[in-house]
Amino acid sequence: MKKEIHPEYIDCTVTCACGNTFKTKSNKSEIKIDICDKCHPFFTGSEKIVDSAGRVEKFKKKYALN
């Protein structure tokens, strides 16, 4: 690798919306995420609807599912 052309690789704290935090390495010092392995339905086995900008409500209204 060439010297002084690569970004600095530092410790990073990743924070999930559920409150879970963990450490990793990145060129950023802090990363915020919406879903992690502690709250993702695949890993927890529970159902959780992830709504992006009201898409679920729009779908329910369109097909009268309320």
Swiss-Prot record:
<keyword id="KW-0689">Ribosomal protein</keyword>
<comment type="function">
    <text>Binds the 23S rRNA.</text>
</comment>
<dbReference type="GO" id="GO:0006412">
    <property type="term" value="P:translation"/>
</dbReference>
<dbReference type="InterPro" id="IPR042105">
    <property type="entry name" value="Ribosomal_bL31_sf"/>
</dbReference>
<feature type="binding site">
    <location>
        <position position="36"/>
    </location>
    <ligand>
        <name>Zn(2+)</name>
    </ligand>
</feature>
<feature type="binding site">
    <location>
        <position position="16"/>
    </location>
    <ligand>
        <name>Zn(2+)</name>
    </ligand>
</feature>
<dbReference type="InterPro" id="IPR027491">
    <property type="entry name" value="Ribosomal_bL31_A"/>
</dbReference>
<feature type="binding site">
    <location>
        <position position="18"/>
    </location>
    <ligand>
        <name>Zn(2+)</name>
    </ligand>
</feature>
<keyword id="KW-0699">rRNA-binding</keyword>
<keyword id="KW-0694">RNA-binding</keyword>
<keyword id="KW-0687">Ribonucleoprotein</keyword>
<dbReference type="GO" id="GO:0046872">
    <property type="term" value="F:metal ion binding"/>
</dbReference>
<dbReference type="InterPro" id="IPR034704">
    <property type="entry name" value="Ribosomal_bL28/bL31-like_sf"/>
</dbReference>
<keyword id="KW-0479">Metal-binding</keyword>
<feature type="binding site">
    <location>
        <position position="39"/>
    </location>
    <ligand>
        <name>Zn(2+)</name>
    </ligand>
</feature>
<comment type="similarity">
    <text>Belongs to the bacterial ribosomal protein bL31 family. Type A subfamily.</text>
</comment>
<keyword id="KW-0862">Zinc</keyword>
<dbReference type="GO" id="GO:0019843">
    <property type="term" value="F:rRNA binding"/>
</dbReference>
<protein>
    <recommendedName>
        <fullName>Large ribosomal subunit protein bL31</fullName>
    </recommendedName>
</protein>
<dbReference type="GO" id="GO:1990904">
    <property type="term" value="C:ribonucleoprotein complex"/>
</dbReference>
<dbReference type="Pfam" id="PF01197">
    <property type="entry name" value="Ribosomal_L31"/>
</dbReference>
<dbReference type="GO" id="GO:0005840">
    <property type="term" value="C:ribosome"/>
</dbReference>
<dbReference type="GO" id="GO:0003735">
    <property type="term" value="F:structural constituent of ribosome"/>
</dbReference>
<dbReference type="InterPro" id="IPR002150">
    <property type="entry name" value="Ribosomal_bL31"/>
</dbReference>
<comment type="subunit">
    <text>Part of the 50S ribosomal subunit.</text>
</comment>
